[in-house]
Amino acid sequence: MIIQINKIILRFSIISIFFISCKYTADSKKEIKNMYPHLAKYIDKVYSMSEKERKGLLLMVGIKDKILSEETIKILKENKIAGIILFDYNVVNEKQLKKLTSDLREYVNPNMLIAVDEEGGKVNRIHFDKLKNISPKNIGDKNDKEYVYKIAYQKSKFLLDLGINMILGPICDIPKDSNSYLYDRSFSTNINIVADMVEATVKAQRDAGIITVLKHFPGHGDTAVNSHDDFPIIDKKISELKNKEFVPFKRGIDAGAEMILTTHIKNKYIDDKLPVSLSKNYITILEKDMNFSGVIITDDLTMTGKIEKGINFGINLNSDIYQNIEYMFEDMKPDIISCAKVLKVISENDYLARKK
């Protein structure tokens, strides 16, 4: 959704991605640190943060700027926003894009997470990407692990050079057939090929130093409906999902993926009320059954299709960006562990330190 700020030319798109915040029963810092010893130092940092700083960690937004404006800087800084997602309208050329990402870190947050969808094929945000015409399907058709590693590594280095340190990919979905809206964006209809390509892609991305985001959990391939347009329902028992849809995600997790993006679909066998993007049941599956300890994020909350057919996400944005952020912040209750996990990813992927 595009939001006009105070009816001037500059525009903002607000709410791109929400980091899912889980609730834990441990009341004291000591108890929480004992539960999550690998997050201990980040838990200490979270306890020293203000409520606004914690909320800012858990929200990623899109901006309309090509050249970072003072107004955008003010909004992002005031609300302690830690994540930005870029789209094609943010991109003019290499020099301009490098300055935009550099300015975001210089004037807003030196540890800013800057993300992009740069899949290749149908989905590209950067028109001068030399690899943009190589789609996941092209890669899957070759079914060559060395080839996919090479492409993923080169693309990751290309993005990092532009100041982008987070890529929304690889796609782990397994399309049922050519009728799936993800058919051309996916590696293959074959489970093993998808899993192999995902594993090699994640290894390349991690070797290059970019943050990996597996998508779209729990698997969006077995539908002809785009969740950005409508509200798909895929009713499969968890045993079925484990034997198919979950396989590429598990391979990506084992290869070192740091984030997983959930989609807006519903499955009555796992949660008969909430979609994946809002359901704790799926988080439990990821953490307990699939041994994922990283950050779980949702797909775009302003692109949830015909929500009257599914669930009302409670998003009611207007023309004032300040009010919109206040609106989204109002009911956010960022828990310690969610914030600590994001801090861990930021710390382990310090863009400026690596650049030096």
Model region roles, listed by residue range:
Residues 136-202, 206, 348-349:
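A substrate-binding/cap region within the structured catalytic cores of diverse enzymes
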Residues 63-67, 116-124, 165-175, 214-220, ...:
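Short glycine-enriched loops at secondary-structure junctions
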Residues 20-21:
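C-terminal motif of bacterial Sec signal peptides marking the signal peptidase cleavage site
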Residues 50-51, 89-106, 112, 122-124, ...:
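Second-shell residues forming the walls of enzyme active-site clefts
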Residues 24-128:
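N-terminal hydrophobic targeting/anchoring segments and the immediately downstream early-domain regions
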